[in-house]
Amino acid sequence: LNSKKFPNSRGIFGRQDITNASKGSVNVGKMTVYVAIGRSKFLPPILLCNARQAARVYAVGESVKTAAVGGGTGKEMLRQTGFNPFIYFSPDKDTRMLQQIMEKHPDFQFVLLNTGHIGEMKIPKEMSQEALNWFFRAADPKLECEELPNGMWMRKADRKFYPDFDVFLANLNEWEADRTNYLKNHPDFKSYTFIQ
């Protein structure tokens, strides 16, 4: 890789340089999207978040520990506000700013991409790619989604992963309760009520 272009050892490639990339236009106009990547054990491949849920996802910053943050195996859970140990402001201020931006700018979108598991099934990279392609190409993604009790939006097509939807909703409630407890006890979120 050209280190002048990729100083952090990550690569960006033009679509014309990728053999099996689609040849059609991918111009989708101006979009402002924050894609958070996590590894859940039960969430669907993609979820759309409202301002409150985006703030909660950002505040908890739940992912897995990898070599990039200290030689992890990819299995140990890690919680880091903003998914980043180098956020500019305090965790509280950074999270507030994200929520305020989303509330003031309805066109700003926040997506949670699950690259972990759905039950025993490992989510393959092709499924993640398909989910993102769907999101960026859909005229209005929410028209193909249903709103969950916690305020997130899930693709109707992804119900196929949950033969017993009540079990999924119970897991979702448990997940929410765990995140709420974490934030309430986090020293940097003294005024947690703004994302309850």
Describe the residue ranges of each PLM region.
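Phosphate/diphosphate-binding loops
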Residues: 1-2
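Conserved NTP phosphate-binding and transfer environment spanning the P-loop NTPase/kinase superfamily
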Residues: 5, 11-196
